[in-house]
């Protein structure tokens, strides 16, 4: 049996083309389709055997949702990701962003990092963004709620950089070592290299290394930040050592003096002052 789990909110709530493709792909196995926002995902998958399979339609946020639903569960069925998101940073990190073949997820759903935010703990796939990048997600969520379909994340980032975002001060602690900053643009905790639809925030981070990478962009003024910002898509921003600290470790705590939006694999949490991310 093939279980097709789809996220109707993926790809800006337009997965009709991907759903048609996966139906054709799985037609011979008499597939069953279920909306993962309306079922007990863990129960559905745990009921399957090793000769069954799951085809998951969605992007990074959908994988994160699946990882949290299955956290601690034992299941036998292989789970494949069918590319149908907008950012697709997980696939980009694997070098499979343009692949038309489903990607086996099972090896990547183990030993995932956790993040604690506002009293809740989540598993995550790619990274935590806190600061400008979190606020971009908050703003674009509002645009989606208004029915805007075509959203340029880079353009929204630049708008906020130039006017809407006020840098907080804060502290970053990695494996017990704390550093204070007066002006923070972003402070991430990366498990993969990418977030934000192609931002190569942590170019040297290796998924599965047992470490996380904290990238702190600080101190720089608006003009300097604007000049260097495009380099985040190639990873060259880390060469701007005057204003970017890159620190690896197993436990990262970030504290801001002002409530700021945070994003977990593209999913927004508003009004955050602190988070802790760690990997076992």
Where do the model's predicted regions map?
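ATP/nucleoside-binding phosphotransfer catalytic cores, i.e., glycine-rich phosphate-binding loops
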Residues: 176, 206, 216-280
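Catalytic core of DAGKc-family lipid kinases
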Residues: 3-6, 33, 72-185
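Glycine-rich phosphate/pyrophosphate-binding beta-alpha loops
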Residues: 129, 133, 188-201
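Phosphate- and divalent-cation-binding pockets in alpha/beta enzyme and binding domains
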Residues: 65-66, 89-90, 135, 263-264
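Gly/Ser/Thr-rich active-site loops/lids in small-molecule metabolic enzymes
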Residues: 144-154, 197, 203-224
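Short glycine-/acidic-enriched loop or helix-start segments at secondary-structure transitions
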Residues: 15, 65-68, 90-93, 198-199, ...
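ATP/NTP phosphate-donor binding region
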Residues: 1-57, 64, 68-75
């Amino acid at each position: 049996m093939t279980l097709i789990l789809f996220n109707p909110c993926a790809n800006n709530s337009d997965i009709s083309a991907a759903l048609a493709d996966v139906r054709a792909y799985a037609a011979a196995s008499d597939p069953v389709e279920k909306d993962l926002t309306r079922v007990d995902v863990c129960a559905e998958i745990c009921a399957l055997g090793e000769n069954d399979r799951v085809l998951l339609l969605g992007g990074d946020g959908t994988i994160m949702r699946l990882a949290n639903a299955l956290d601690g569960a034992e299941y036998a069925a292989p789970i494949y990701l069918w590319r149908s998101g907008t950012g697709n940073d997980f696939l980009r990190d694997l070098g499979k962003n343009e692949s038309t073949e489903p990607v086996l997820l099972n090896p990547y759903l183990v030993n995932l990092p956790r993040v604690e935010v506002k009293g809740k703990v989540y598993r995550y796939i790619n990274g935590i963004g806190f600061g400008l990048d979190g606020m971009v997600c908050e703003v674009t969520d509002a645009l989606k709620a208004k029915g805007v379909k075509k959203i340029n994340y880079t353009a929204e980032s630049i708008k906020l950089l130039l006017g809407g975002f006020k840098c907080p001060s804060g502290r970053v602690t990695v494996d017990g070592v704390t550093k204070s900053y007066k002006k923070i643009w972003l402070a991430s905790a990366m498990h993969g290299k990418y977030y934000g639809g192609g931002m190569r925030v942590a170019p040297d981070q290796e998924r599965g290394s047992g470490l996380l990478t904290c990238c702190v962009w600080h101190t720089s003024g608006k003009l300097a930040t604007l000049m260097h910002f495009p380099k985040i898509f190639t990873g060259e921003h880390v060469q701007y050592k005057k204003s970017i600290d890159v620190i690896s470790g197993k436990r990262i705590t970030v504290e801001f003096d002002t409530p700021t939006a945070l994003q977990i694999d593209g999913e927004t949490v508003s009004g955050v002052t602190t988070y802790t991310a760690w990997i076992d």
